[in-house]
Amino acid sequence: MAVKRIKNHSSGKRQTVVVDYKSILTTSKPEKSLLVTLPKKAGRNNQGKITIRHHGGGHKRKYRIIDFKRNKDNIYGTIKSIEYDPNRTSFISLVVYADGEKRYIIAPKGIKVGDKIISGNENIDILLGNSLPLEFIPEGTLVHNIELSPNAGGQITRSAGASAQILGFDETKKYILVKLNSGEVRKFRKECRATIGTVSNDEHILENLGKAGKSRHLGVRPTVRGSAMNPNDHPHGGGEGRSPVGMDAPRTPWGKRHMGVKTRNNKKSSTSMIVRRRK
């Protein structure tokens, strides 16, 4: 896989760095039976109020139904294509199983068309793209698409280039210790499933959109500085010219302390599952 640096033909292209999709993807047409309509919300809730800032516009998309559960056990599937998915940073692969069923999965790094994958329990080989419970995966193995609770479907380590490392059982033998990308060490139920390998498109982090219009195509609206707003819109707003914050610490748009303040609630039930906080 490679990235392309666009030549300086115009100011919109001057800083652009993009992933060379043509060298990776095998088709531009998705599987129609696995597509559903994706209505645009523009960051609004059912009352029309903004609940997520900087969302809106963007190119029309359809959602690809992804198999995060990987619960089709002991039936081999063949990788038929590696495709672009506008709804995530990683690539996706179309899998056709021996019984004819088709499913999309998150494409692991290094997977190729024609490769065989399988899901199951202790009898499954530790090979790229295979999915099995954490208790049967050897220490040191890199995995992705990890379940937070059994049969819930993968929720952790799904973005481009992400992976987590198996560290082994804890002292109770009921949980598996896993080191996440952030450096956090966390306990997972040993029955939770994970997929072998690293998520594809690891060079996504090197991309540079180059111009504001590219962000608008992705549905990302501008982020305005608080100091450029009016005082009724932001705690940093108002004043004559470029005024300082005027407080002992920066604030969020809702008046809470910002930068360097821990916001995690220690009373969350999942706190007991965190062995070491992220760096």
From Swiss-Prot:
Region (Disordered): 223-279
Keywords: Ribonucleoprotein, Ribosomal protein, RNA-binding, rRNA-binding
Record's GO cellular component terms: large ribosomal subunit
Record field: compositional bias (Basic residues): 254-267
Keyword Transmembrane helix belongs to the record: no
Record-level GO BP terms: cytoplasmic translation
GO MF annotation terms: rRNA binding; structural constituent of ribosome; transferase activity
SMART domains the record matches: Ribosomal_L2 (SM01383), Ribosomal_L2_C (SM01382)
Known role: One of the primary rRNA binding proteins. Required for association of the 30S and 50S subunits to form the 70S ribosome, for tRNA binding and peptide bond formation. It has been suggested to have peptidyltransferase activity; this is somewhat controversial. Makes several contacts with the 16S rRNA in the 70S ribosome.
Similarity remark: Belongs to the universal ribosomal protein uL2 family.
Quaternary structure (record): Part of the 50S ribosomal subunit. Forms a bridge to the 30S subunit in the 70S ribosome.
Protein name listed in UniProt: Large ribosomal subunit protein uL2
Organism from which the protein derives: Ureaplasma parvum serovar 3 (strain ATCC 700970)
UniProt gene name: rplB
